[in-house]
Amino acid sequence: MPKQHVVLLSDLPADLVPEFFRTAQRLERAVEDGLPADGSMILINNVISQSVPHLHLHVIPRNKRDGLRFWLGPRRRYDASDPAEAYAERIRAALPAP
Protein backbone atom coordinates (compact mmCIF):
# COMPACT_ATOMS: atom_id res chain seq x y z
CA MET A 1 0.00 0.00 0.00
CA PRO A 2 2.09 3.03 1.03
CA LYS A 3 5.28 3.25 -0.99
CA GLN A 4 7.05 4.80 2.00
CA HIS A 5 7.89 2.06 4.49
CA VAL A 6 5.80 2.28 7.64
CA VAL A 7 4.86 -0.59 9.90
CA LEU A 8 1.71 0.70 11.59
CA LEU A 9 -1.20 2.90 10.63
CA SER A 10 -0.15 5.26 13.43
CA ASP A 11 3.28 5.59 11.75
CA LEU A 12 1.77 6.81 8.47
CA PRO A 13 2.37 10.56 8.06
CA ALA A 14 -0.90 12.50 8.30
CA ASP A 15 -0.59 13.84 4.75
CA LEU A 16 -0.58 10.25 3.39
CA VAL A 17 -3.61 9.02 5.34
CA PRO A 18 -6.20 10.31 2.82
CA GLU A 19 -4.36 8.63 -0.09
CA PHE A 20 -4.17 5.35 1.84
CA PHE A 21 -7.91 5.31 2.46
CA ARG A 22 -8.77 6.46 -1.08
CA THR A 23 -6.79 3.46 -2.32
CA ALA A 24 -8.61 1.23 0.17
CA GLN A 25 -11.92 2.55 -1.13
CA ARG A 26 -10.94 1.83 -4.75
CA LEU A 27 -9.85 -1.71 -3.84
CA GLU A 28 -13.04 -2.34 -1.90
CA ARG A 29 -15.19 -1.27 -4.85
CA ALA A 30 -13.13 -3.39 -7.28
CA VAL A 31 -13.43 -6.48 -5.06
CA GLU A 32 -17.19 -6.06 -4.66
CA ASP A 33 -17.79 -5.23 -8.35
CA GLY A 34 -15.29 -7.67 -9.85
CA LEU A 35 -16.17 -10.71 -7.78
CA PRO A 36 -19.44 -12.25 -6.81
CA ALA A 37 -19.51 -10.42 -3.46
CA ASP A 38 -22.41 -8.90 -1.55
CA GLY A 39 -19.97 -6.83 0.48
CA SER A 40 -16.53 -6.96 2.02
CA MET A 41 -14.60 -6.82 5.24
CA ILE A 42 -11.62 -4.48 5.44
CA LEU A 43 -8.98 -5.42 7.96
CA ILE A 44 -5.74 -3.78 9.15
CA ASN A 45 -3.55 -5.61 11.65
CA ASN A 46 -1.11 -3.65 13.80
CA VAL A 47 1.71 -5.90 15.08
CA ILE A 48 -0.46 -8.81 16.27
CA SER A 49 -1.43 -10.98 13.26
CA GLN A 50 0.45 -8.63 10.92
CA SER A 51 1.75 -11.02 8.24
CA VAL A 52 4.46 -8.65 6.97
CA PRO A 53 5.99 -5.70 8.86
CA HIS A 54 4.57 -3.08 6.49
CA LEU A 55 1.28 -1.21 6.66
CA HIS A 56 -1.25 -2.91 4.42
CA LEU A 57 -4.89 -3.86 4.48
CA HIS A 58 -6.93 -6.87 3.53
CA VAL A 59 -10.14 -6.56 1.51
CA ILE A 60 -12.03 -9.79 2.07
CA PRO A 61 -15.01 -10.44 -0.20
CA ARG A 62 -18.12 -11.45 1.73
CA ASN A 63 -21.45 -12.97 0.80
CA LYS A 64 -24.46 -13.63 2.96
CA ARG A 65 -24.15 -17.01 4.60
CA ASP A 66 -20.61 -17.47 3.25
CA GLY A 67 -19.62 -19.37 6.36
CA LEU A 68 -16.86 -16.95 7.35
CA ARG A 69 -17.18 -16.34 11.04
CA PHE A 70 -15.31 -13.31 12.18
CA TRP A 71 -16.03 -11.84 15.56
CA LEU A 72 -13.83 -9.48 17.52
CA GLY A 73 -15.68 -10.04 20.76
CA PRO A 74 -14.42 -12.08 23.65
CA ARG A 75 -14.45 -15.85 23.52
CA ARG A 76 -16.08 -15.78 26.90
CA ARG A 77 -18.69 -13.57 28.51
CA TYR A 78 -17.45 -10.40 30.12
CA ASP A 79 -17.32 -10.48 33.88
CA ALA A 80 -19.78 -8.07 35.47
CA SER A 81 -16.81 -6.39 37.15
CA ASP A 82 -15.19 -5.76 33.75
CA PRO A 83 -13.05 -2.60 33.95
CA ALA A 84 -14.43 -1.15 30.69
CA GLU A 85 -14.82 2.38 32.06
CA ALA A 86 -11.30 2.34 33.52
CA TYR A 87 -9.95 1.21 30.13
CA ALA A 88 -11.96 3.92 28.37
CA GLU A 89 -10.47 6.54 30.69
CA ARG A 90 -6.92 5.29 30.05
CA ILE A 91 -7.53 5.48 26.29
CA ARG A 92 -9.00 8.99 26.55
CA ALA A 93 -5.93 10.08 28.54
CA ALA A 94 -3.58 8.65 25.89
CA LEU A 95 -5.48 10.18 22.96
CA PRO A 96 -3.42 12.98 21.39
CA ALA A 97 -5.10 16.31 20.73
CA PRO A 98 -6.37 16.70 17.14
Name the predicted role of every residue range:
Residues 1-98:
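HIT superfamily nucleotide-processing domains
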